[in-house]
From Swiss-Prot:
Transmembrane portions of the chain: none
Enzyme Commission number(s): 3.1.-.-
Known function: Probable serine hydrolase. May be related to cell muscle hypertrophy.
Note: This gene may have been partially duplicated (see SERHL).
Protein name: Serine hydrolase-like protein 2
Active-site residues, Swiss-Prot/TrEMBL: 108
Molecular function in Gene Ontology: hydrolase activity
InterPro entries: AB_hydrolase_1 (IPR000073), AB_hydrolase_fold (IPR029058), AB_hydrolase_sf (IPR050266)
EC primary class: hydrolase
Top-level taxonomy: Eukaryota, Metazoa, Chordata, Craniata, Vertebrata
AB hydrolase-1 domain sequence ranges: 33-293
Gene of this entry: SERHL2
Amino acid sequence: MSENAAPGLISELKLAVPWGHIAAKAWGSLQGPPVLCLHGWLDNASSFDRLIPLLPQDFYYVAMDFGGHGLSSHYSPGVPYYLQTFVSEIRRVVAALKWNRFSILGHSFGGVVGGMFFCTFPEMVDKLILLDTPLFLLESDEMENLLTYKRRAIEHVLQVEASQEPSHVFSLKQLLQRLLKSNSHLSEECGELLLQRGTTKVATGLVLNRDQRLAWAENSIDFISRELCAHSIRKLQAHVLLIKAVHGYFDSRQNYSEKESLSFMIDTMKSTLKEQFQFVEVPGNHCVHMSEPQHVASIISSFLQCTHMLPAQL
């Protein structure tokens, strides 16, 4: 194990999929209740390196790199990255791990993917923890934007495929500056942590591991209607914990329609799930689980260790 290995890490995993492999890292007890950890857009499994050592170690935590991220294989040429394909990755991973029921811990984009898996396979999920992320992204009044996202996604992929440019080589300083400029919520320490897994050394510097076809998260996400959101929430069969950072994703939504859509979703979860839904606000920014993991660790630990059974929602 390298000197940069995360505290408590017990193994690196490589799970076979038709286009190559999904990489993951594991902590805790193999005999413990399983928890699948899902990272944010263009992040990787190392985003949980500082949080998981603070959680109960009698659980088994597996943090996967989504396809095209971290150490996971890129999708085959011509195959797009869509929300449904990321959801199917989860199904493949848990099948390889032989998990029949497990909990999900998802940050940002990982929470959206985990939420969609939760609603698609409700019988498989014991608990869902959303780290500064909505369960879904709802359609806003700006419907034209949705078409713009879809068009931009297609054009970007075609442009990348046509260019066939070799990977750009950077110094660590250059990559860190780029990363922090586009992610103001990241500290330098957290940025370096992500780059350790998100880059590969070559003779003249570092190259990014991520698939260049990945650009904007909006291009890969399916926006859903309020009716589908409410219907999906009614199908949930487990407890849900939503942790909101004071200066995080929800706070950054400037558009009134976006804020109103988020309020609708949270209110629907509160009224439908009742005691099955827990909403907690903590100090910090969108990456609080990395920069200040102590602010969320005890909340997540208590939620995971709660053993009361939930009635099935019919």
